[in-house]
UniProtKB/Swiss-Prot annotation:
<dbReference type="InterPro" id="IPR002328">
    <property type="entry name" value="ADH_Zn_CS"/>
</dbReference>
<dbReference type="Pfam" id="PF08240">
    <property type="entry name" value="ADH_N"/>
</dbReference>
<dbReference type="GO" id="GO:0008270">
    <property type="term" value="F:zinc ion binding"/>
</dbReference>
<feature type="binding site">
    <location>
        <begin position="296"/>
        <end position="298"/>
    </location>
    <ligand>
        <name>NADP(+)</name>
    </ligand>
</feature>
<feature type="binding site">
    <location>
        <position position="101"/>
    </location>
    <ligand>
        <name>Zn(2+) 2</name>
    </ligand>
</feature>
<feature type="binding site">
    <location>
        <position position="112"/>
    </location>
    <ligand>
        <name>Zn(2+) 2</name>
    </ligand>
</feature>
<keyword id="KW-0479">Metal-binding</keyword>
<dbReference type="GO" id="GO:0045551">
    <property type="term" value="F:cinnamyl-alcohol dehydrogenase activity"/>
</dbReference>
<dbReference type="GO" id="GO:0009809">
    <property type="term" value="P:lignin biosynthetic process"/>
</dbReference>
<dbReference type="InterPro" id="IPR020843">
    <property type="entry name" value="PKS_ER"/>
</dbReference>
<dbReference type="InterPro" id="IPR047109">
    <property type="entry name" value="CAD-like"/>
</dbReference>
<feature type="binding site">
    <location>
        <position position="98"/>
    </location>
    <ligand>
        <name>Zn(2+) 2</name>
    </ligand>
</feature>
<feature type="binding site">
    <location>
        <position position="68"/>
    </location>
    <ligand>
        <name>Zn(2+) 1</name>
    </ligand>
</feature>
<feature type="binding site">
    <location>
        <position position="67"/>
    </location>
    <ligand>
        <name>Zn(2+) 1</name>
    </ligand>
</feature>
<keyword id="KW-0862">Zinc</keyword>
<keyword id="KW-0521">NADP</keyword>
<comment type="function">
    <text>Involved in lignin biosynthesis. Catalyzes the final step specific for the production of lignin monomers. Catalyzes the NADPH-dependent reduction of coniferaldehyde, 5-hydroxyconiferaldehyde, sinapaldehyde, 4-coumaraldehyde and caffeyl aldehyde to their respective alcohols.</text>
</comment>
């Protein structure tokens, strides 16, 4: 450990082009309650695209993206009791919170108003946070989770964001009961994990998509019980009032009213996708039948650990395409075109340093 911090190598965006290239920087000195982690794999989330292209207007360049991190502990501070060197661990969307607000007190650190996000955030010392497209992380132990040995580390990486984003509201709103009927809207990175968790909970799962071509994927590859095209008026009408709950994972603008019609009275819809345009929600659509609509943003540390433990017990991992670091820009371009089944994961430990050396010599 260097006196002034740990030398780190990452791949960073430097402007709104979003193009990533090698970037050397320094992680903070390991503190008493810190865990130092060698990054093995990091998933690519659509949020990373928003950040590196400054689509949310808050990019702090240069910025290293990545918040779906799986790695191995290489060092711990003197006060660390939860982890030891050699443990396989994960880091998700945030790496710190205030610990003093109402949300933190109730165990919902993910809703802390001053939560420190893993990439493109500002820590409590004023430094910009750099994410998991890097070879090393230094994180407080309370924001690190244990990854079960039964999970493949590459397939586990997207669980740190996409997995907990669907798992958390399913448990929170009782959409995890055997025999209940769950609708999963969208069959992408979030949706395919919603199907997997729903089936593991013993639920009847119907995939709802605007793309009829995804029927085979939903029923064959993922084992959903039924498929419903949102463009099929007759099919939608026949399925009215049949579902106990719906997880809406779609990030493109779409009408909610046809989806709400699928819910039984007192049914629950949870929105986890984030369309850029405001969603339209006429009051009558929820008044009739006493239906409820909620949102969800990732999950707490405890929820993330519970999700990983459940995934480990039931063999749930993301379906991933692993890419080398020198292919990350191409992967980001494909993600922008929705050309992935279902998540990209970067092989950080296996390819980063070779990719940086090749970039330096070119």
């Amino acid at each position: 450990m260097e006196h002034n911090g740990t030398a780190a190598l990452g791949w960073a965006a430097r402007d709104t082009s979003g193009h990533l290239s090698p970037f050397s920087f320094t992680r903070r000195v390991q503190q008493e309650d810190d865990v130092t982690i060698k990054v093995l794999y990091c998933g690519i989330c659509h949020t990373d695209l928003h950040i590196i292209k400054n689509e949310w207007g808050n990019a702090m360049y240069p910025v290293v993206p990545g918040h779906e991190i799986v790695g191995v502990v290489t060092g711990v501070g003197a006060g660390v009791t939860k982890f030891k060197a050699g443990d396989t661990v994960g880091v998700g969307y945030f790496v710190d919170s205030c610990r003093a607000c109402d949300s933190c007190g109730k165990g919902y650190e993910n809703y802390c108003p001053t939560m420190v996000i893993t990439s493109n955030g500002t820590d409590y010392g004023g430094a910009t946070t750099q994410g998991g497209f890097s070879d090393v992380m230094v994180v407080r132990q309370d924001y690190v989770v244990r990854v079960p040995a039964s999970l493949p580390p590459d397939g586990a990486a997207p669980l740190l964001c996409a997995g907990v984003t669907v798992y958390s509201p399913m448990v929170e709103y009782g959409l995890n009961g055997p025999g209940k009927h769950l609708g999963v809207v969208g069959l992408g990175g979030l949706g395919h994990l919603g199907v997997k968790f729903g089936k593991a909970f013993g639920m009847k799962v119907t995939v709802i998509s605007s793309s009829p071509a995804k029927r085979g994927e939903a029923l064959g590859r993922l084992g959903a019980d039924a498929f419903l095209s949102s463009r099929d008026g007759e099919g939608m009408a026949a399925a009215a009032a049949t579902m106990d709950g719906i997880i809406d994972t779609v990030s493109a603008g779409h009408p909610l009213v046809p989806l709400l019609s699928l819910l039984k009275p007192k049914g629950q819809m949870v929105v986890v996708g984030a369309p850029a345009m405001p969603l339209q929600l006429p009051a009558y659509a929820i008044i009739e039948g006493g239906k409820r609509v909620a949102g969800n943003g990732v999950g707490s540390v405890a929820e993330c650990q519970a999700m990983l433990d459940f995934a480990g017990e039931h063999g749930i991992a993301a379906d991933v395409e692993v890419v080398a670091m020198d292919a990350v820009n191409a992967a980001l371009g494909r993600l922008e075109r929705n050309d992935v089944r279902y998540r990209f994961v970067v092989d950080v430990a296996g390819t980063m340093h070779a990719a940086a050396a090749a970039a330096a010599s070119s």
